[in-house]
């Protein structure tokens, strides 16, 4: 009877060990993030999907992001996205090279004003010339 319990315990630990070691080295793309972190989510293997201008959640890059981008009223890749969604006329990209999308603003000056209040001045210069 003791050997059956011991064998069951060994199988349980072996199975658990297999699942735990499969994710070793893989990036954990869970939790809260900010599009202003560099890199967002602590690694460039994950994407920060904003739910607000300052806060988002980390996810693995996939088609899920594209769907979230299309559905979110303020996420954009171009000025045309903002006009199509009715969220503004200008797509102000985050001053973070790891974020390939932006946020809709009414105008370029509104975006520059907003980002100038929350980002270092030297970083803003490189963004406004892009």
UniProtKB/Swiss-Prot annotation:
Sorted UniProt keywords: Disulfide bond, Knottin, Seed storage protein, Signal, Storage protein, Toxin
SS bonds (residue pairs): 29-46, 33-48, 41-58
Region forming the signal peptide: 1-26
Positions of the propeptide removed during maturation: 64-69, 123-130
Molecular function terms, GO-annotated: nutrient reservoir activity; toxin activity
Top-rank taxon, per record: Eukaryota
InterPro entries xref list: Albumin_I, Albumin_I_a
SUPFAM superfamilies named in the record: omega toxin-like (SSF57059)
Post-translational modification summary for this protein: The C-terminal glycine may be removed from PA1b.
One Pfam family here: Albumin_I
Tissue: Major component of both the cotyledons and embryonic axes of mature seeds.
Role of this protein: PA1b binds to basic 7S globulin (BG) and stimulates its phosphorylation activity. Involved in the signal transduction system to regulate the growth and differentiation as a hormone peptide. Toxic to various insects through binding to a high affinity binding site in the insect gut.
Domain observations: The presence of a 'disulfide through disulfide knot' structurally defines this protein as a knottin.
Further remarks about this protein from its record: The protein sequenced in PubMed:3755437 was probably a mixture of the products of genes C and D, PA1b being of C origin while PA1a is of D origin.
Name recorded for this polypeptide: Albumin-1 D
């Amino acid at each position: 009877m003791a050997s059956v319990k011991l064998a069951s315990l060994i199988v349980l630990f072996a199975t658990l060990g297999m699942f735990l070691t499969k994710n070793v080295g893989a990036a954990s793309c869970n939790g809260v993030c900010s599009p202003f972190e560099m890199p967002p989510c602590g690694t460039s293997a994950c994407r920060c999907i904003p739910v607000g201008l300052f806060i988002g959640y980390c996810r693995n890059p996939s088609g899920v992001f594209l769907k979230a981008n299309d559905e979110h009223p303020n996420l954009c890749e171009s000025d045309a996205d903002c006009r199509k969604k009715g969220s503004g006329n200008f797509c102000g990209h985050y001053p973070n090279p790891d974020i390939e999308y932006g946020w809709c603003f009414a105008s370029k000056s509104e975006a520059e004003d907003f980002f100038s209040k929350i980002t270092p001045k030297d970083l803003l210069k490189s963004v406004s010339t892009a």
